[in-house]
Regions:
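Small-molecule-sensing regulatory modules
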Residues: 3-4, 8-55, 59, 79-103, ...
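Short, structured active-site "lid" loops
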Residues: 54-73
């Protein structure tokens, strides 16, 4: 990868870093597909060119992506917020992508919740060190590469600090989390701090943001009597305002609005109660807002 400094001119392809494997890899490629970018067909490919959009994708270890982007080797990348915070790379977060969510927590045997004077095993030493320093807690960090759940049982640590998604792995190891989360993580889009964005970067950010928003909303259409329109619009205010159209029946109107996906069934029930009929829900694949 030496020599592939991020070129910010439109004559050169935009170089983008993506996870090559792990929990983020498939979702990262999928969101780019939905944003109109071609992706590799073979998971063994380390690079792929999308000539239509002028983008080169490089598939790298998730932990290395912030380093490549922060050094200017690649212009932009997708990684985890936890990995960025632990990297010391000169890269910053652009946009949360609403997948790969987890928390970074301390855990130990049931009943133990003391950090001061403890040996803390973790694969994220920079992140943990920063937290301890911010809280003025004196503890010893035991750096491990990979799974740390066995560190307490094997006697090399008193506490572990690790990414927690469901907590199932910790329970199997006889551990439980304690204290507040050190960090709430998700997949994020990153760039080098202070870099100048060109039109290709702006387009990629805008497209991905459109997919992120579209996944969070649905489009709701319904007919409602004019006498109930105000109540119905209170339930479906949309992002700015709902679209209202006349119908052949003069006492009825048609309404269209974006509604939070997680709220849509409750909203449909409430619309029905105020007299709305013909309530339809449509997925949104992308948007520009």
């Amino acid at each position: 990868m030496r020599g592939f400094k991020a070129d910010m001119t439109n004559t050169q392809p935009l170089k983008v870093a993506l996870p090559n494997k792990g929990s983020l890899a498939e979702s990262a490629s999928q969101i780019l597909k939905e944003a109109g970018y071609r992706q590799r067909n073979d998971v063994r490919d380390l690079a792929f060119i999308d000539p239509d959009n002028g983008v080169e994708f490089y598939y790298l270890r998730p932990r290395d992506i912030a380093t490549y982007v922060g050094s200017g080797e690649l212009a932009i990348g997708i990684t985890g917020r936890d990995l960025l915070e632990d990297s010391n790379a000169d890269a910053g977060e652009i946009l949360g992508l609403d997948f790969g969510k987890s928390t970074f927590r301390f855990a130990s045997i049931p009943g133990r919740s003391e950090l001061s004077g403890s040996r803390i095993a973790t694969a994220y030493p920079t992140l943990v060190r920063g937290f301890l320093e911010s809280k003025k807690i004196n503890a010893t960090i035991v750096g491990l590469d990979g799974a740390v759940e066995s560190a307490i049982r094997l006697g090399v640590a008193d506490v572990i600090a690790d990414v927690v998604s469901t907590g199932g792995t910790l329970k199997q190891a006889g551990l439980e989390v304690f204290g507040d989360p050190i960090l709430t993580s998700e997949a994020i889009l990153i760039e080098r701090r202070g870099s100048i964005r060109d039109s290709k970067i702006d387009t990629l950010i805008r497209r991905i943001n459109g997919v992120v928003i579209a996944r969070q909303y649905v489009l709701v259409d319904y007919d409602v009597p004019k006498s109930s329109l105000e109540k119905a619009c209170e339930l479906t205010p949309g992002l700015e305002s709902p679209t209202i159209s006349p119908l052949q029946k003069p006492e009825w109107v048609a309404v269209r609005a974006m509604v939070k996906r997680n709220d849509v069934h409750a909203v449909m029930d409430q619309l029905w109660e105020v007299g709305a009929r013909g309530i339809l829900v449509t997925d949104i694949h992308s948007c520009r807002l």
